[in-house]
């Protein structure tokens, strides 16, 4: 702490990102990255962009990328906003749309950046508890509020809500922004983007980090009706007019246009998720039903922190959260079948 800090800084509780360890022969299953490399078309576009005139600034409105996203999701270009990862898109969303006289609502077990952003932007927030089965109950959000944000599927649980439930939530909050964070939607959920034409209060946020395997490029986007997108643009242009470099725009555009690669890799991840769930359950784990590229599991005979440490000793890294109700759970990214087999073998040594 320093006397030179602005008053808000001392009160901040920064987000703690997943570890990026540098270990030989590591099975890295802790940050929900894709186990497969990006689309070859995306890699080719990135290389080509690196050969262009990098002394010039990139397109500040990322028109080509927004056109590709709009075409993929059958919306207009003016209904698409892009940013430097979905985290930046979410940050602009908090600043532009979520501060009101009544509190912002989000789940108590969820993406912890929501709490961080609420603190950063001075937003009053109420954390709504998950039910006994670790599910989001839409009825619990029928309370005084100024806005709502929740992930679907939720993280770290992986449990998704059907589109009908999401529509109920949006319809229950007319005149209030409802933000659906769909970082993991491509692994089994049904996107709320289809509801955007019907609801002027709905904003849907997605990322290229998971199903498009571009976590290292940092590209995210939001889709909503034009007034919501305009609010995000006003915040962006008051913060950083050039959030996406040439390589990011080119790579993401090629990635979203490569439908064959997308379907093949997400299909493999979904199949591997089913296999890993079965193997964990055979060994006594409780595994929550996942629609994400990870599973959330606990063993009745072993503390989560202890299991995570023993796996680490065997060069297998998973994510543990030392938080109430979920301290015995491990969040395990779906790797390749070979990586999942190494995880299972390590578990057989420690259980």
UniProtKB/Swiss-Prot annotation:
GO molecular function: histidinol-phosphate transaminase activity; pyridoxal phosphate binding
Keywords tagged on the record: Amino-acid biosynthesis, Aminotransferase, Histidine biosynthesis, Pyridoxal phosphate, Transferase
N6-(pyridoxal phosphate)lysine: modified positions: 210
Record lineage: Bacteria, Pseudomonadati, Pseudomonadota, Alphaproteobacteria, Hyphomicrobiales
Pfam family, one: Aminotran_1_2
Organism the protein comes from: Rhizobium meliloti (strain 1021) (Ensifer meliloti)
Residue ranges of the TM segments: none
Biological or metabolic pathway of the protein: Amino-acid biosynthesis; L-histidine biosynthesis; L-histidine from 5-phospho-alpha-D-ribose 1-diphosphate: step 7/9
A GO biological process held by the record: L-histidine biosynthetic process
SUPFAM superfamilies named among the record's database cross-references: PLP-dependent transferases
Quaternary structure annotation from Swiss-Prot or TrEMBL: Homodimer.
Catalyzed reactions per annotation: L-histidinol phosphate + 2-oxoglutarate = 3-(imidazol-4-yl)-2-oxopropyl phosphate + L-glutamate
Name the UniProt record assigns to this protein: Histidinol-phosphate aminotransferase 2
């Amino acid at each position: 702490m320093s006397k030179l800090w602005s008053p808000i800084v001392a009160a901040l509780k920064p987000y703690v990102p997943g570890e990026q360890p540098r270990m030989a022969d590591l099975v890295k299953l802790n940050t929900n990255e894709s186990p497969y490399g990006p689309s070859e078309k995306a890699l080719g576009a990135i290389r080509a962009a690196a050969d262009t005139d990098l002394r010039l600034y990139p397109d500040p409105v990322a028109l080509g990328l927004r056109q590709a996203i709009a075409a993929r999701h059958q919306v207009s270009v003016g209904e698409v906003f892009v940013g430097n990862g979905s985290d930046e898109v979410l940050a602009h969303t908090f600043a532009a749309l979520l501060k009101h006289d009544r509190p912002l609502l989000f789940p108590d077990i969820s993406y912890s950046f929501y709490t961080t952003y609420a603190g950063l932007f001075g937003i009053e927030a109420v954390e709504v508890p998950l039910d006994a089965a670790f599910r989001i109950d839409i009825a619990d959000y029928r309370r005084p509020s100024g806005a709502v944000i929740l992930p679907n599927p939720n993280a770290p649980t992986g449990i998704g809500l059907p589109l009908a439930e999401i529509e109920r939530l949006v319809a229950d909050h007319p005149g209030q922004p409802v933000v659906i964070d769909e970082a993991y939607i491509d692994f089994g959920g049904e996107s709320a983007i289809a509801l955007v034409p019907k609801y002027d209060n709905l904003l849907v946020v997605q990322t290229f980090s998971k199903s498009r395997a571009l976590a290292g490029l940092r590209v995210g986007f939001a889709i909503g009706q034009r007034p919501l997108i305009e609010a995000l643009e006003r915040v962006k242009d008051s913060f950083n007019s050039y959030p996406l470099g040439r390589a990011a725009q080119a790579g993401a555009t090629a990635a979203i246009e490569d439908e064959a690669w997308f379907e093949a890799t997400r299909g493999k991840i979904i199949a591997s998720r089913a296999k890993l769930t079965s193997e964990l359950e055979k060994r006594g784990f409780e595994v929550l039903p996942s629609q994400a590229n990870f599973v959330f599991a606990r063993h009745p005979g072993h503390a989560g922190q202890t299991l995570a440490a023993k796996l680490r000793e065997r060069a297998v890294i998973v994510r543990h959260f030392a938080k109430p109700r979920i301290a015995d759970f491990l969040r395990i990214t779906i790797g390749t079948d070979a990586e999942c087999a190494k995880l299972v073998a390590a578990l057989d040594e420690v259980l």
